[in-house]
A protein has these predicted regions:
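C-terminal motif of bacterial Sec signal peptides marking the signal peptidase cleavage site
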Residues: 21-22
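HKD-type phospholipase D/PLD-like phosphodiesterase module
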Residues: 31-79, 89-307, 344-404, 411-426, ...
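Short catalytic-loop micro-motif centered on adjacent basic/acidic residues
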Residues: 83-87, 177-178, 312-317, 341-342
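Acidic-and-aromatic substrate-binding clefts and catalytic sites of carbohydrate-active enzymes
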Residues: 87-94, 318-324
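Long, C-terminal catalytic modules of enzymes
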Residues: 387, 391-396, 401-477
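Acidic, Ser/Thr/Pro/Gly-enriched interdomain connector segments
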Residues: 472-498
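Small-residue hinge/turn detector
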Residues: 501-502, 530
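Alpha-helical interaction/regulatory segments in DNA maintenance proteins
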Residues: 509-510, 514, 524-543
Length: 543
């Protein structure tokens, strides 16, 4: 695909100027693995694949991997009528540029973002930047260095207008909403990462549209990007399912009624299964209310899929904190299914991490184990964390089952994803697809640290010494009120109500602090609570 003139011009600037500064030119000496066959209707890509290489646009270095940004750009570039994108964060200029170009050509573009990431970096004031957390301030500093094309430490409006992705989107007047479009302060997390083009072509990925999730942190030469996967699927039937999810969130769009639905405001739907060529595909959208049966949730679908295993289960997960899934894996292990697991290091050893269970350990938090915690009686030694370049993360959310079936998408294996976030989970039964994910798992598993780190063992020992008795809470003994008093309920209790996430629960608490509720009319005055929501609460709330 030919990039339009503006992008060619700035690519040249990158090529000429960055060579003299922080750019790292690396001659291709990579030993590539033989590429695996791709399914004609479902292509699989990994940003750290060892069977391909590409030259980065921004840092101008040749490296191993698939260029995920280019895959997204090329898919959008073929659009003739429509492009719908729902993604947590969009910071990649080439994607913004192609969206602007396609809109000029008359293609209908719609974009949904997470409200925490829906502003151009360049729009932040000094006071706002000062209030950002450490990680976000570091990201802002990376952005400043990224847009300073000539590296003169003087950022111009021209530089910003070409490289601040959301400013490009804004200047192109591309229709954009976020999860505050329902009148709330935002849902739990709009965590989707999908694209639908011309009601036919679909991208589903674990990657946000950022440098760190695709090619790597701009100012860190050793960074190769958080490890992610991307699926390109040619299926009008699948595109229809994703468009339905998109339309629920979109409502009537920009500046219209506050009829968008996010999080638990969305109607619950059952998983949908389609046949596409040689593949059987099942799709489910999160979240689901914790008052609904767990087996109907996305984690429930994961559980059902894991339970089919008779040979092997390999996991590569950013977060793993769902106890019931760990219990299912233990049952499979007891049936001699071989299980291997890789967990992102920053989450692998938290008190809620199921990696600890799989290794046979428990770590309490303030003298209390997680609810229903169950360390394995026959622990395994095939649980570990990958050794990655400094700053890079294991951002995958996939499992490979019996070399036949793949579970992937944006959905982390956690309660937050299951009961709070807007997510997509996709299960694909096709050995050709599974082979790609198996190769990716094997690559990551070839460089790992297994076992319990000494500092975590010290934490466990310290908790045992400091706590007279460590509580072992059980869901069977935790009382759940049949009716919830809105004037005294805890935030956790409020979040069990249909349609209530963290942010709405907080708004209820703030409202009652100002004036106690005495009627449904009082409750209905809270932004984000509709008549339909109140109808769902009938018989389960009091004041």
């Amino acid at each position: 695909m030919s990039i339009f003139p503006q992008m060619r011009y700035f690519s040249c600037i990158f090529l000429l100027l960055f060579t003299l500064t922080i750019c790292e030119r690396v001659k291709s000496g990579n030993q590539l693995l033989t590429p695996l066959p791709q399914d004609p209707l479902i292509q699989v890509y990994f940003n750290n694949s060892e069977s391909s290489e590409y030259r980065e646009t921004y840092r101008q270095k040749t490296r191993l991997g698939d260029d995920l940004e280019t895959q997204i750009v090329d898919t959008i570039a073929q659009a003739k009528s429509t492009v719908d994108i729902a993604v947590q964060e969009l910071r990649l200029p080439k994607i913004a540029q192609i969206l602007a170009q396609k809109q000029k050509e008359g293609v209908k573009i719609r974009l949904i973002l997470e409200s925490n990431y829906s502003r151009p970096w360049s729009s932040f004031t000094s006071a706002e930047i000062a209030k950002l957390g450490k990680r976000e301030q570091e990201r802002y500093q990376d952005f400043q260095k990224f847009v300073d094309i000539n590296q003169d430490h003087q950022i111009t409006s021209e530089e910003i207008s070409q490289l601040d992705a959301l400013l490009i989107v804004k200047n192109a007047q591309i229709p954009l909403i976020d999860d505050t479009a329902d009148g709330s302060k935002g849902s739990n997390l709009m965590h989707h990462k999908f694209v639908v083009v011309d009601h036919r072509f679909v991208i589903i990925t674990s990657a946000n549209f950022t440098l760190s999730d695709t090619s790597g942190d701009f100012t860190n030469p050793s960074s190769l990007g958080n490890n992610n996967n991307l699926l390109k699927i040619d299926s009008p039937e699948l595109a229809t399912l994703l468009t339905q999810e998109f339309n629920i969130m979109w409502g009537d769009g920009v500046g219209g009624k506050q009829d968008s639905k996010f999080g638990l405001q969305k109607p619950p739907r059952q998983p949908k299964t389609i046949t596409l060529g040689n593949s059987k595909i099942t799709v489910h959208f999160s979240p689901i209310s914790p008052t609904q049966p767990w087996n109907l949730s996305s984690n429930g679908l994961i559980d059902q899929t894991l339970s089919t295993s008779t040979k092997t289960v390999d996991l590569a997960l950013f977060v793993f904190s769902d106890q019931q899934l760990a219990n299912t894996l233990e049952n499979l292990h007891d049936q001699e299914v071989q299980i291997r697991a890789l967990i992102e290091p920053q989450f692998a050893y938290r008190p809620y991490s199921e990696a600890l269970d799989m290794m046979g350990f428990s770590l309490s938090d303030n003298c209390k184990y997680e609810v229903d915690n169950r360390p394995w009686k026959n622990p395994i030694s095939t649980v570990g964390v990958p050794i990655l370049p400094q700053g890079d993360l294991l951002h995958h959310k996939f499992a490979v089952i019996d070399h036949q079936t793949v579970i992937t998408g944006s959905h982390n294996w956690s309660e937050a994803a299951n009961h709070g976030n807007d997510e997509i989970l996709i299960v694909i039964e096709n050995p050709t697809i599974a082979n790609h994910f198996q190769r990716e798992f094997n690559r990551l598993y070839s460089k790992i640290k297994t076992g319990l780190p000494a500092n975590i063992q010290s934490k466990i020992d310290a908790e045992v010494k400091q706590c007279p008795q460590i509580q072992k809470p059980s869901s069977s003994t935790i009382s759940t009120p049949t009716k919830i008093n809105l004037n005294i309920a805890t935030q956790a209790e409020l979040e069990t109500l249909p349609g209530v996430g963290k942010k709405l629960a907080q708004k209820i608490i703030i409202a009652r602090q100002q004036q106690k509720f005495t009627s449904l009319e009082d409750v209905g005055k809270i932004p984000g609570i509709s008549d339909k929501t109140l109808a769902k609460w009938e018989g389960i709330i009091i004041w």
